[in-house]
Amino acid sequence: MTVIIQGRSFPDDLTQYAEFIGQGLLSPEEMRRIDQNAQALGISGLELMESAGTGLAMAARQYQPGKILILCGSGNNGGDGMVAARHLAGEADITVFWYDSGRQTDSTRTQLQRLLSCSVTSIPFRSRDDLIEHTRIFQDTDLIIDALLGTGGTGSVREPVRTCIEFANNAKAPILSADLPSPGIIPDRICAFHRAKTEGAHIYGIGIPLLAEISTGPGDLLILRNRNPDSHKGVGGNILVIGGGPYQGAPYLAGLAALRAGADIVRVVSPHYLPEPDIIHVPTAGDRITTADLATIIPLCKQADVVLCGPGLGPESHDVITSLAPYIRKGVFDADALRDPLPVAGESLYTPHAGEFARMSGLSPGKTPRERAHAIMKAQILGTVLLKGAVDVICDGSRVRFNQTGTPAMTTGGTGDVLAGVCAALMAVVPAFEAACIGAYVTGRAGELITQTCGYGMTARDLLTAVPQVLFRSTSERE
């Protein structure tokens, strides 16, 4: 029996995979990733908000307050506070100050409509003067709940939220912060949802599935940033692909994939020229890349943001890659670059299938995703490994992530070259581990889309057309 998640099978005993949950404090960015992935698994944002607000109400009851003042921002943290107010209505005298910014999230707007049907005092504020008018309420309460910013708080706090925090700190009542204290506020207690984001927090579960944390998903793309309107050529990445010889098309597929994933400039060092006008071809002397070509390639490695080595290279040219590695700041190593001795760049990403992993590490990768994760950690490779399979395993030696997107139709030749190219483009803008997670997720989803129309007739070139549909549609939806 298996559990089917996002098109690929996963072992049904997921309790074995709890060991891959990250340890320590959770960053706000990581929590947003998990939240988004939970929604992709069918847990709606409203459901998560209801669970968070219920936990916040439970924490508030421990104070046994007669009067509660709840301060709600316009983001999802404010929605958590509104849910808590609804649950506490009738148990205490509830006053809700909510920031009427005109930019509430959809979920918070829904919770506000629900709140207005409850027996609570609801007071919108738009300015510092609105708060000054109600200063007395801050002093005449038994508990203040801070649901102003939470994990959404970044940078300096602006008015009128700054005054709201000032008045809360000057009040006599204890402050209970929802999830993460708003910047500048001094809480008596922190009610953290799912996992702690700061020391001393009390954790309340909100029903987030395990796979939302340990698997890739649309939330992984949140780290990507849209380009500024004044961006210039090169800001998306200058990628160098080194490959070709026995297999002429592989480096070009990888280069085109990098372009489709947002790279601005792609050069391909290869013995053979294929007419691809979007790619800059750098020829080598013979039918294979040899050490005689180092003088040509080394300056290009120094110039590139990311160097992708290996597609279509052939084993005879492996010594060239090991000689180039010291000159590579960020490197993606695939195919015939995955041999002993393993090349190590300043920052390295390795993209082996099971056989290549065994060849480069001397270890059996195992069969299950769990066994493969342990094999990568045991190998102690200096970099991030994306071990391809029915379920891809991404590991940087400490963090582990699983990717379940994809389809059996992706066994067609060249899909690994596309994945490597996508990862190279992403690595120009994010670290290797994140590039591997996003690259695996996006390439797999692209394969799922193409399979709907092409079935098992899909080619790697077909995959190129779907990569930007997945990657940049998801990017625009974050706006």
Curated annotation (Swiss-Prot):
Region (NADPHX 1): 76-80, 150-156
UniProt-annotated stretches for the region ADP-dependent (S)-NAD(P)H-hydrate dehydratase: 216-479
Domain YjeF C-terminal per the UniProt entry, residue ranges: 216-474
Cofactor(s) of this protein: K(+)
Chain segments carrying region NAD(P)H-hydrate epimerase: 1-214
InterPro entries associated with the record: CARKD, Nnr, Ribokinase-like, YjeF_N_dom, YjeF_N_dom_sf
GO molecular-function term, one example from the UniProt record: ADP-dependent NAD(P)H-hydrate dehydratase activity
Presence of keyword Plastid: no
Stretches for region NADPHX 2: 353-359
CDD domains, alphabetized: YXKO-related
Keyword set, alphabetical order: ATP-binding, Isomerase, Lyase, Metal-binding, Multifunctional enzyme, NAD, NADP, Nucleotide-binding, Potassium
UniProt remark on cofactor binding: Binds 1 potassium ion per subunit.
Biological process according to GO: metabolite repair; nicotinamide nucleotide metabolic process
Positions of (6S)-NADPHX 1 binding: D179
Catalytic activity: (6S)-NADHX + ADP = AMP + phosphate + NADH + H(+); (6S)-NADPHX + ADP = AMP + phosphate + NADPH + H(+); (6R)-NADHX = (6S)-NADHX; (6R)-NADPHX = (6S)-NADPHX
Binding site for ADP: 388-392, 407-416
Enzyme Commission number: 4.2.1.136, 5.1.99.6
Function: Bifunctional enzyme that catalyzes the epimerization of the S- and R-forms of NAD(P)HX and the dehydration of the S-form of NAD(P)HX at the expense of ADP, which is converted to AMP. This allows the repair of both epimers of NAD(P)HX, a damaged form of NAD(P)H that is a result of enzymatic or heat-dependent hydration.
Name of this protein: Bifunctional NAD(P)H-hydrate repair enzyme Nnr
